[in-house]
């Protein structure tokens, strides 16, 4: 049986559960008899092992099973009778004081789900991101595609695209191959020496002083110059120090970017090389990417608004569970990138804020969906998968990938559900359009 529910905190509750010892003993004996039918022991036939031996071997385990079952049943009945929605799992502890003779007592401490009160959606303020894909953005994207297809040719040597001109010195946009050695106070340092090292001048891969020391050299020439490492340089051993570098230029290659012609269009998948079709294809891909990013920004604004108008306490146990899930996800992601995660600390507090937001939003979304019947419809899920498939070479394989696995389809359903909530809120809230520059939306990726 269980006592009345005690309120320990806003969401924390406690129930005391008592179980008669005689009831436990009766059930233990019953289960031992069942177990004895199949127990084997040296010198005895199956099912003929003395009950005393069976009890010695399995008694402790079965007693724990019986107690867990009795306490679990009483806990479930008590929470059901009191209409409590339990968050996470209860903490069960034996109670040793003020216990009647012939009974066992346990305290079950747990948290309950809060009453979710979503505020007035009409008072919510949401920013809807607006971005225009103009001809200038299409031109920038085509330039990026050209740079991705650049070919390098040795300066001074004839190629199908010329010899790079009469200037045989290294300049910005050239790819150079060098030998270099760096010293600090006359001593070489780790990472300060290499042979046959290639990089493109002007891309910013090397420190500006290093690139400046390379520009203007011809093949075979050497140069010695000082270089000051920034205080925040990633190499702690040299950060903030001044080194002396000697470089020898081994090779200079000039960059040839393809012309925007039929061959270039074909390299982008336009079979007949039609440039108008190419631009239309680039525009379509850009608009798809912009649409996805705009939706993501607008969704974030909607979620922020929902959090702002909805005040309630979040069960700590759910935050802890989500924190652990985020930690494990981060650990797996870093391991897949080849990092040795066993030596890295993962303080839970790094993930707590994000975990609380995710749990809070999950509770809010569930309430909005339930209150307004915004569940994902099968036709919506199908349309979303088909939209995903458009971005791939073989759409049928993408469709098969999702529809052959219920868990993958559940991920799509969750996205559709979120979109339903976003659209519903946009129809109720105070929505202000916010124009955003293309480059800002794309994180300056359009600059190449």
UniProtKB/Swiss-Prot annotation:
EC primary class: isomerase
Catalytic activity: [protein]-peptidylproline (omega=180) = [protein]-peptidylproline (omega=0)
EC id: 5.2.1.8
A GO biological process held by the record: chaperone-mediated protein folding
Domain of life: Bacteria
Function: Involved in protein export. Acts as a chaperone by maintaining the newly synthesized protein in an open conformation. Functions as a peptidyl-prolyl cis-trans isomerase.
Record keywords: Cell cycle, Cell division, Chaperone, Cytoplasm, Isomerase, Rotamase
Gene Ontology CC annotations of this record: cytoplasm
Family to which this protein belongs: Belongs to the FKBP-type PPIase family. Tig subfamily.
This protein's record includes keyword Cell wall biogenesis/degradation: no
PROSITE patterns: FKBP_PPIASE (PS50059)
Domain PPIase FKBP-type stretches: 173-258
Places the protein is found: Cytoplasm
Domain notes: Consists of 3 domains; the N-terminus binds the ribosome, the middle domain has PPIase activity, while the C-terminus has intrinsic chaperone activity on its own.
Protein name per UniProt: Trigger factor
Record InterPro entries: PPIase_dom_sf, PPIase_FKBP_dom, Trig_fac, Trigger_fac_C, Trigger_fac_C_sf, Trigger_fac_ribosome-bd_bac, Trigger_fac_ribosome-bd_sf, Trigger_fact/SurA_dom_sf
Organism: Herminiimonas arsenicoxydans
């Amino acid at each position: 049986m269980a006592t009345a529910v005690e309120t320990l905190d806003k969401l924390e509750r406690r129930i005391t559960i008592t179980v008669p010892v005689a009831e436990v003993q009766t059930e233990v004996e019953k289960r031992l008899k069942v177990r004895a039918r199949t127990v084997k022991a040296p010198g005895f036939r199956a099912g003929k092992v003395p009950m005393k031996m069976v009890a010695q071997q399995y008694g402790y385990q079965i007693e724990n099973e019986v107690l867990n079952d009795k306490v679990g049943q009483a806990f479930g009945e008590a929470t059901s009778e009191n209409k409590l929605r339990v968050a996470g799992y209860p903490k069960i502890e034996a109670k040793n004081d003020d216990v009647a003779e012939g009974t066992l007592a346990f305290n079950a401490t747990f948290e309950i789900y809060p009453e979710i009160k979503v505020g007035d959606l009409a008072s919510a303020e949401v920013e809807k991101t607006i971005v225009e894909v103009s001809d200038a953005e299409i031109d920038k994207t085509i330039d990026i595609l050209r740079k991705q297809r650049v070919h390098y040719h040795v300066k001074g040597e004839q190629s199908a695209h010329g010899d790079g001109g009469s200037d045989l010195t290294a300049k910005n946009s050239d790819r150079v191959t060098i030998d270099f050695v760096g010293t600090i106070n006359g001593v070489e340092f780790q990472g300060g020496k290499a042979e046959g090292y290639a990089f493109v001048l002007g891309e910013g891969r090397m420190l500006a002083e290093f690139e400046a020391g390379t520009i203007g050299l011809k093949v075979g020439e050497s140069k010695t110059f000082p270089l000051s490492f920034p205080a925040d340089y990633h190499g702690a051993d040299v950060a903030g120090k001044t080194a002396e570098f000697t470089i020898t230029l081994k090779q200079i290659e000039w960059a040839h970017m393809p012309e925007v012609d039929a061959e270039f269009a074909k390299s982008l998948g336009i079979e007949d090389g039609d440039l108008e079709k190419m631009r239309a294809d680039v525009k379509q891909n850009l608009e798809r990417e912009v649409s996805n990013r705009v939706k993501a920004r607008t969704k974030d604004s909607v979620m922020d608004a929902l959090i702002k108008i909805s005040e309630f306490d979040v069960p700590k146990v759910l935050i802890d569970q989500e924190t652990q899930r985020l930690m494990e996800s981060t650990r797996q992601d870093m391991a897949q990138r080849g990092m040795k995660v066993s030596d890295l600390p993962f303080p839970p507090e790094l993930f707590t804020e994000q975990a609380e937001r995710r749990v809070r939003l999950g509770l809010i979304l569930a309430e909005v969906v339930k209150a307004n019947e915004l569940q994902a419809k099968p036709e919506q899920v199908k349309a979303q998968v088909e939209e995903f498939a458009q971005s791939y070479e073989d759409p049928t394989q993408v469709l098969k990938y999702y529809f052959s696995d219920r868990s993958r389809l559940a991920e799509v359903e969750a996205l559709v559900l979120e979109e339903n909530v976003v659209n519903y809120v946009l129809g109720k809230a105070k929505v202000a359009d916010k124009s955003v520059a293309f480059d800002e939306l794309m994180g300056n990726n359009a600059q190449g």
